[in-house]
């Protein structure tokens, strides 16, 4: 079927209209909170604050910087493994994130910081908006190279909306703890993206798989994203934790889990290869699974050795998923997952939710102290009578709610994106920048003769049979 992928009017129209809408909505609703407002000195006196250094900006901004780098650099470069889709990977991630944070500030603001008809925003609002966009970046990985910029913008609009609703239900109604977003960010985002990818499945795509491979250089660029994500993940999981021991604990637990995950990923990658060699796709992705899985329990008394166990397990599970599960999903369920988000985010996200539920249910005053238990799980107000075992049940329920929002929401949005009016690429043009980007003549020649190609991100039966070794002079 012929597809009109020309974006000359569609993309400018949607960008202009939506940005104008953002300007209008921000003008009507959004204002600075007390700590960003010129009335801060008055607020200081009212709250008996003695120094400007107690402004939340100085406490949260370092974490915000780290999270911001993860969203725009980490996720963007992680997806550059596709040999002919580097521009789209980084720049479309940039586009969806830039739009998504604006819409997230509004959606999350209406649910959480809506006071007297206005949304009050501060540095913590910026962190939460980045978290919301993180779930969209995850979902984008499932459809990478197969959708148009307009479809990406539409997906961002709907997913941010669903994320805000799901987050509000989990945090405000179920009263769950999910500091690092194993449920709200990773489980929801991954299953939303996987469902959209399944709805948009292309049965003939495997016949045009030569563009889906990676090269030595593209894999190196992807490793840049991996390293940024890996280094800053402790900040991600602790960014919105309460001041003091909870935030300190979250960073330590994430640090330990990530470290353990690297070793088991390397070990299993070597074991499953007949020649004992390492697969770069495993090192790029599975090494991060420990950060995903420790997210929900990051603030809890998981203990350092418990964090190592979580990372140990996730390195194994994620690597085996890339090796054995991805081909099954592709061949049996027609679920083409470009970046392997099922193995990096979905399964580790579920593991993280389960770890959080069990850790919460096992909490005792002997471990936390009575005051610490109350502070950790916010057992106050209408939740003052909640016990750790009941909290564990609600934590488990949060997994189900996130799954439901991801799958049902992804189904609806996938059906909308499947309409033949959004300028998506044809099968033969998937995973190719040439469809939506103006490339120089020498760039196109490099694309046509990509040297040293070795396809690591595809199931075995998708790989090209005749790979020729090319030595560089």
UniProtKB/Swiss-Prot annotation:
The chain crosses the membrane at residues 10-30, 62-82, 87-107, 126-145, 152-171, 180-200, 220-240, 252-272, 286-306, 308-328, 344-364, 397-417. InterPro entries: Ammonium/urea_transptr, NH4_transpt_AmtB-like_dom, RhesusRHD. Keywords: Ammonia transport, Cell membrane, Glycoprotein, Membrane, Transmembrane, Transmembrane helix, Transport. It is a multi-pass membrane protein. Homotrimer. It holds the Pfam family Ammonium_transp. Functions as an ammonia transporter. The keyword Zinc does not apply. Residues 1-9, 83-86, 146-151, 201-219, 273-285, 329-343, 418-473 are cytoplasmic. GO terms for cellular component: apical plasma membrane; basolateral plasma membrane; plasma membrane. Coiled coil: none annotated. Residues 31-61, 108-125, 172-179, 241-251, 307, 365-396 are extracellular. It comes from the Eukaryota. This is Ammonium transporter Rh type C. It is found in: Apical cell membrane. The gene is rhcg.
